[in-house]
Amino acid sequence: DAIMYGGLVGSRKHNESLDTLMARENRIQRLHPMYPNVPIYAFGTIMRTPYASNSGVEPYYYAKYGHDLYVLSGLQDKMDLGTLTKDEAAEMLSLKLSIPSEYLQDWFKRRTKNHAINRLLLKDTKSGIFAYFCEGHDDNSTNSQSAMEARYLGKESAKLSPKVYGSFPGADQLALLLIARYHNDVNHLTPSFTSIYPLGRAEDTVPSYESQPIGKTIAEHVEAVGGIMDPKGRPDIVLAVNTPLSSTGESGQFSNYGMMKPSTTEFMNQVKAVIDKGIPVSMVDVYFANGSDNTLMSLMKQHDLLYKVAAYNGWNTASNTIGYAIAQAILAPDMSETDHRDMLTEQYIDNWAYQANVRKNINRLTELERTNYI
């Protein structure tokens, strides 16, 4: 995305011609023949289909028509699958008539260009240009334009080995994930992982902003770094995945006020038992999206585990958290004690202090000031 569009946000808002994008992609093709002994690890993303009407990181018209575009793309995906009902067909026609045609054309034209580039990068993967290529699904949901594009790319990539190609939810975690993959490759490592969960839906939990169970996403990320899941013997790393009893919510919700929950208490006992055995534990806190679970963090502090884990993550989407949790746990043994402690401290300040607590208070104060000003 950085080479093709100038970055992830740029991939959503650019006005580049397809010829310009293809010329940039051609430069990537030429890298491998020029430097055949240098492995290339790369990632791209399937453009997201957000349901929120926010123009800050989307084209300007998303402020008014963003949600309508989201609903429309979901209906078009259903039509492609052959599951569209008569009522939904009528709704789809109504949306097409209500959204200005120039906005519809702009949005789908940009998506078409991005999809064409993704197909070219997939072709490069088949040609051996990349040591490993990862296709991230940015904020994907079950029915959307993103899901439809992923489905078609999935058909084209069906015969590719998972050792050279991966396609799964997420975007922000991909660069660090590839660093961990390179680390494993050059050191001839095949780390093994096992996951533990609290009571509830566990690996069958489908988190917010994503379209598949979290257990599948974890397995795909482990495969992406060259690891294996559920070894017969002692694992190299245990992923302690903090999932809710039912569905995931937002960390800024009132329900995230830190009330003690029996399931979380028992889960923390599991974590402590694994650490006492000397097995590295990486905390995958996906109870809420966009921030830490205050109950979990209070128990980690109470049990003096904040700096005894290999890694902690609880930020943004579940796949972002999973990718960082796996990658940081792989890289942690090669960090100095100071660097490792600093890494954890940064996560606690960002994920726990800011995202789960400070941010919601800032938002409330900002809204209060705006209301008073009006």
Regions found by a protein language model. Name each.
Residues D1-I374:
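An N-terminal assembly and electron-transfer interface module characteristic of large anaerobic redox
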